A protein has these predicted regions:
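Alpha-helical protein-protein interaction modules
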Residues: 1-142
């Protein structure tokens, strides 16, 4: 289900340089705070952006293990959404939709407008699962 046009990793040089610099700094934070789920999830997003799929998945999954929603509904819900973004960015639509379907149920989950408009979710546009999640959040007509 992966398509080069819908995954990250083939970034223009200036953007790749920015992601690489961000990765260096974020990796320092993870080394200082190895049990910080948020820091690890952000590192996973950066790695997804750089096309480092295995690292991104490992970091995102580890972050969700460190901060499950049954331990912290707000921040754990946010970590689930980060894992969904990682899935979207590496072309794993199943992972992205599975996690996003869970993440939208929490207060920190993305809104209808965010899913509809933010480019973060562009890799999933047109995927029936994603479109179903978006439609489920649509406001009721007056």
């Amino acid at each position: 289900m992966e398509d080069a046009s819908t995954t990250m990793g083939n970034l223009p040089a200036p953007l790749a340089a920015a992601f690489t610099a961000a990765r260096t700094e974020q990796e320092k934070q993870v080394q200082i705070h190895p049990d910080d789920a948020g820091a690890l999830a952000v590192l996973g997003l950066i790695d997804a952006g750089l096309g480092r799929k295995e690292e991104a998945l490992r970091e995102g999954r580890r972050a969700s293990e460190l901060l499950p929603v049954d331990k912290d509904r707000l921040n754990g819900g946010r970590i689930i959404v980060y894992l969904a973004m990682i899935g979207a960015w590496i072309g794993d639509h199943k992972l992205a939709c599975d996690q996003l379907g869970k993440g939208v149920r929490y207060p920190t989950g993305p809104s209808y407008g965010q899913l509809k408009l933010l480019p973060t979710w562009d890799p999933l546009r047109g995927d029936p699962c994603f479109e179903e999640i978006v439609a489920s959040l649509a406001p009721e007509p007056n």
